[in-house]
Amino acid sequence: MDSPEVYEVVDASPEKPMEIAIVGGGIVGVILAIGLTRQNIKVRVFEQAASFREIGAGMAFNACARNCMDLIDPVITQALLRCGAVNMSDVDAEDDYLRWIDGYNQHRPEDPSYQRPLSEIGGAGFRGCRRDQFLEELAKEVPQGAVEFRKRLASLEDNTDNGPVVLNFTDGTRAEVDAVIGCDGIKSVVRKQMFGTNHPASNAQYTHKVAYRGLVPMNRAVEVLGPWKAGNFHHHVGPGAHLTHYPVANNTVLNVVAFLSDPNPWPDNQRMEMEGSREDVLTGLKGWHPTVLNLVNLLPEKLSKWALFDLCEFPAPSYSAGRVCIAGDAAHASSPHHGASACLGVEDCLCLNVLLAQVRETVAANQDPAKNRLALSRAIETAFKTFDTVRHKRTQWLVNSSRRVCDLYHQPEWADPTRWAKAETCFEEIRDRSYKIWYFDVDGMVKQTRDEYELRQHGEKLGNGTNGVFSDERHGGYTL
C-alpha cells in the first residue's frame, strides 16, 4: 500500500452508518452489498465495467449456498428463482443428480447411443441458472445510487486508525470509507494492493486446462442425447478431457462446457479468454464416443476459449490486511471442476455479514463518541482477521481439491480397458470431496465466527496478546 498519510478524525457516531466499499460488482460483490445494506450499513460498490456484466454461462448453487443466501437476505434466493433457476435435484431429498458416464468408449456396438454409467451421487436442492440472468435479478435489490460504474481501482491507502481508507481510481477520483472488501475476482487489484504487484499470490497461475462454453437449444440437445440425458446433469469423462452439461433457463437451453488438457503455456496471462472454435473441441475429443461428438457439433462454430487459472500454486497468505480484505475469487480463485467457487463465495458473504453486524454492535456500545473512530477501526480489523481465520482453510482446500478431481476425470486409464477397474475407484474419493462441500455446517461457521470475533475483542481489551484462534477440535461441528 502507499506511503502513510495523516487524516483528521472523522465522526463515527452510532447515528452515522458504517460505510463499506466493495470493489467488484459481480455476483459475490452484489450479494454482499445486499446483505450489508439490510443491516443499515452504507455500501458503495465500485465496478470497473460500464454496467453489471457477467458471461452467459451456466452455474449451479448447492443447498448449503442457498441456505447462506436465505440467512443473508431471502431476497437473494428469490432473485435466483426469478432468473429461471432449474431444479437439478430434488429440493427435499437426496437425489443422485451428478452423473458420470464414459464419454470415450463404445461398450455396445449394436447401440451407438449407449454410454456406460460410471457413478451417481448428489445432494438435495441444487439449482442451475445463467450467470448473467442471476446478476441481473440481484442488481434490482441493490439500492439506487449504491453502485458506481467505470471505476477502475488504482491504489489503496490504509495508514491510520483515525482516518478513512482511501480508494484512488484511474480516472483521478477518490473515495473515503471505513473499510474495503475486494470482490474483484481472479485478477483482483485489491489483492495486488495487499501483497504488492510482485508477490507470487498477486497473480493467478495457468492450470493447463481450457474450457469451451456454449449453449444448445434443448430441442436440439434432446435429438442427440435423448430426453433423460439432456434433462439431467452429466459429466462425460475420458483421457485428457471431460464434457459437462446441464439444463438452464427453465429447461429451454442446455449449458455445455468442454474441458481440455493443454500442455503448452498460455500465450497471454493478461487475457484469460481468446477466440476458439467448435473444431478445436472436436480435435481435442478425437476418437471419443459419437454421442459426445454429435453434441459438440450442435455448438456454435465460434466459441470462447477460456484459460483456467487459479491461486493453487501461490495462495494468498491471508485474506485481510488492516481494514482491507478480499473475498470470493479475489481471495481463493479456483478452477471450476467442483462447480463450487460461487457457492463458497456466498459462504464468505454470510461470514462477513455476521462480522460486520458485530462491528456495528461494538461501536454502538461505545459511550465515548470521541473514541468511536478508533473503536470502529479496531473492530473492523478484528472482524477481517476473524474472517481470515474462519474461511482460509476451507476455501484453500477447495482450490486444491478442484485440481485433484480434474486429474481424476482426465485419467489416461479411461482409454485402456485393462485399467478401467482402477480408474473407477476414483469415484469414492470424488464423493467424499463433494460431501465436504455440500454438507458444510453453516450454523457451526456462524457460531465460530461470532465466538472468534468476541474472543479477539476480549483478548485485545485484556491486552494479553491472544489472537483468539479456535482450533478445529474446539468446534467439532465445524468442518471443511
Curated annotation (Swiss-Prot):
Cofactor(s) in the UniProt record: FAD
Positions with a binding annotation for FAD: E47, A60, R131, D329, A342
Gene Ontology MF: a single term: FAD binding
InterPro entries (UniProt xref): FAD-bd, FAD/NAD-bd_sf, FAD_monoxygenase
GO terms, biological process: secondary metabolite biosynthetic process; terpenoid biosynthetic process
Induction context: Expression is significantly up-regulated under xenovulene A producing condition.
Membrane topology: Single-pass membrane protein
Compartment list: Membrane
Keyword set, alphabetical order: FAD, Flavoprotein, Glycoprotein, Membrane, Monooxygenase, Oxidoreductase, Transmembrane, Transmembrane helix
Broadest EC class assigned to this enzyme: oxidoreductase
Protein name according to UniProt: Salicylate hydroxylase asL1
Source organism: Sarocladium schorii (Acremonium strictum (strain IMI 501407))
Gene coding for it: asL1
